Amino acid sequence: MDAQGLAALLQKRLREYLNEGADHLATGGAKDYPEYQRMVGRIDGIALAERELLDLVK
């Protein structure tokens, strides 16, 4: 697998994790505020990683 293929696979995986987290929150999946905060932080971190990956691929 070349670098472009690896980057595309990683971006797809990151996007899946981001969407799963957003769906979890959107459906009321957080049982309390600390879990909500943790999930928002996770989504923010995944979004940052995806942006960095896209910047590196340019």
Regions found by a protein language model. Give the residues of each.
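Intrinsic-disorder/low-complexity detector
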Residues: 1-58
